[in-house]
C-alpha cells in the first residue's frame, strides 16, 4: 500500500483525472477494448490512478497478471465483488491491502471503498468515523453492489437502509457501484449514484428504468472523473470514444 501511495503522489504532479471500471476482469473482447480505451485516454491526458468497483477477476477471483499489464501504468485501487470473494486474500496481497475496505485521498477528493459481500455493520462503523474525520470537499463511496439500479440485479434495500442516512449526514457526493453490467446515472434526493458495470464482462439487458434514472446505456465503457476547482466532472466513454454520459457535481462551500 505504501508503494501505491508513493506512485500516486508522484502522479499528482499531473492533472487529477481518475479512471473507473467495474465487472471488468474477464477474458473477453469487451475487456480488451476497455483496456485499450484506458490506454488511449492515458496517452492523451495522463490518469492519476485507476479505481474499480469490483469483480476484478472472473470467475472466482484468481489474479490474472496479463489483464493488469494491459491497463495504463498507474496505481490501481480496487473495490471487491462477489466474483472476487473466493480468492479475496490473494487480491488483497496483490494490491498491498490489509483489508477490503479503506480510504484514499486524491487532491480535493476522498474515496471510501467498502466490501459489499460481508461484514457490513463493522464497515459502517469504520465509514462513519472516516467520514467524520475527512476534510475533503468531495467524498465518493465505491462498492460493488449498487444501492439503486435498473439492472437485473437491481438496487439493494439492505445497503440503502444501512448506508443512506450516513452518506447524507456527511455530505457524500457520489456513490459508484457495479454488479449490474451496464452504465447508469441515478439521482436520489440530490445524491448521485453511478452504476459502472461495463468494464468487460458480458453485458445483459436492464429492466425498465427506475424513477431515479437519468442516463442509461447497455455498453462496455469506462468512467472518468476529473477533480476540478469547481467540482467533480464525470463522463463515460464507450470503447470507440463515444460519450455516453456527462455530469458535474459542484464542490460544496
Show where each model-derived region lies.
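N-terminal active-site segment of His-dependent metallophosphoesterases
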Residues: 12-63, 149-150
Amino acid at each position: 500500500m505504501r508503494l501505491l501511495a508513493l506512485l500516486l503522489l508522484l502522479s499528482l504532479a499531473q492533472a487529477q483525472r481518475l479512471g473507473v471500471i467495474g465487472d471488468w476482469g474477464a477474458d473477453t473482447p469487451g475487456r480488451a477494448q476497455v483496456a485499450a480505451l484506458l490506454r488511449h485516454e492515458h496517452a492523451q491526458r495522463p490518469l492519476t490512478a485507476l479505481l474499480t468497483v469490483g469483480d476484478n477477476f472472473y470467475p472466482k477471483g484468481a489474479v490474472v497478471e496479463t489483464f493488469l499489464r494491459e491497463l495504463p501504468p498507474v496505481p490501481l485501487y480496487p473495490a471487491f465483488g462477489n466474483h472476487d470473494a473466493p480468492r479475496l486474500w490473494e487480491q488483497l496481497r496483490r494490491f498491498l491491502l490489509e483489508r477490503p475496505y479503506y480510504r484514499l485521498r486524491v487532491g480535493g477528493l476522498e474515496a471510501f471503498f467498502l466490501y459489499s459481500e460481508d461484514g457490513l455493520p463493522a464497515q459502517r462503523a469504520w465509514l462513519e468515523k472516516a467520514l467524520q474525520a475527512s476534510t475533503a470537499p468531495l467524498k465518493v463511496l465505491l462498492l460493488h453492489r449498487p444501492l439503486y439500479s435498473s439492472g437485473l440485479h437491481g438496487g439493494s434495500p439492505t445497503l440503502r437502509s444501512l448506508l443512506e442516512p450516513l452518506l447524507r449526514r456527511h455530505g457524500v457526493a457520489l456513490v459508484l457501484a457495479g454488479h449490474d453490467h451496464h452504465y447508469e446515472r441515478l439521482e436520489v434526493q440530490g445524491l448521485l449514484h453511478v452504476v459502472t458495470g461495463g468494464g468487460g464482462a458480458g453485458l445483459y439487458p436492464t429492466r425498465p428504468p427506475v424513477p431515479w434514472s437519468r442516463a442509461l446505456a447497455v455498453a462496455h465503457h469506462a468512467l472518468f472523473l476529473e477533480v476540478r476547482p469547481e467540482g467533480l466532472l464525470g463522463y463515460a466513454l464507450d470503447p470507440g470514444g463515444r460519450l455516453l454520459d456527462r455530469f458535474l457535481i459542484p464542490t460544496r462551500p
